[in-house]
Amino acid sequence: LIARRWERLYNRLPDGFVVETPLYAGGHLGVTKMEQVENEEFSLEKVVPEVVEYVEKELKTPTPVIAAGGIWTREDIEHAFDLGASGVQMGTRFACTYEGDASDRFKQAYIDATEEDVVIIQSPAGLPGRALRSPFIDKYLREGTVGNKPCIANCLTHCRYRTERKTFCIAQALIDAFFGNWEEGLFFCGTNVTRITKKEYVADIIAELFGPQENK
C-alpha cells in the first residue's frame, strides 16, 4: 500500500525495503500489538521471501530487501542472503564500537546487560518496543507514566504524551539515554545486547564478519 501510494502520488518507489523481525530487533518492533512480538509469522524466514517475491512480481524492480533484527554473525548474514535479502541492517552489533557517538555510559549499559534486563514496553506511540530495564523503565512499567518533562519535539503523529501527558516524552528519553542518563533514559536494544562484553573497533567487527581487510 505504501509503495503504490508513493508511486501514484510522487512517481517514486522505495529505494529499499527493510524487513525487521520483532523476535530479536531493538527499538520499535514493526508490529502494532504486544502479542505479535513473539509470533513466528513475523520471522525473517517467513517475511523476507514474501517481500522479495512481492518486489519481483508486483513492482518488477531490482529494489533491495534488507533483513534486520538479530543479525550478529557471518552465518546470520549468509542466512539472510539465502532467504533472498540483498543486505542486512545491524544495529546492536555496532552500538558499542569506539567510533559510535553514544556516551560511554550508554555503551556500559549494553555491556552490563543480562537477559533479565531486556523488556518489552508499549511506547508513547502505542507500539511495542524492546529496551533495557533502566530505573526509568522500571517506574514506567510499575506506574504506566513517568511524564514530568515538556514535549520537546512534536515528533510523532500519534503520541499519548503530547495529547494526554501520559507515558513519557520519547524524544527526551532517547536523548537522555544517548548522553548516558541511566536514571531517566530509554535504552532501546535488540536481544543480542547480552552478547556484547566490551567496546570494539568497527574494523575488528568487520574483520570478524568478512575477514581482515587490506589497506588500499
Predicted segments, located by residue:
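Active-site glycine- and acidic-residue-rich loops that bind
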Residues: 1-7, 71
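Glycine/serine-rich phosphate-binding loop and adjoining beta1-alpha1 elements at the start
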Residues: 18
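Conserved active-site-proximal phosphate/metal-binding subdomains
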Residues: 14, 22-44, 48-66, 72-216
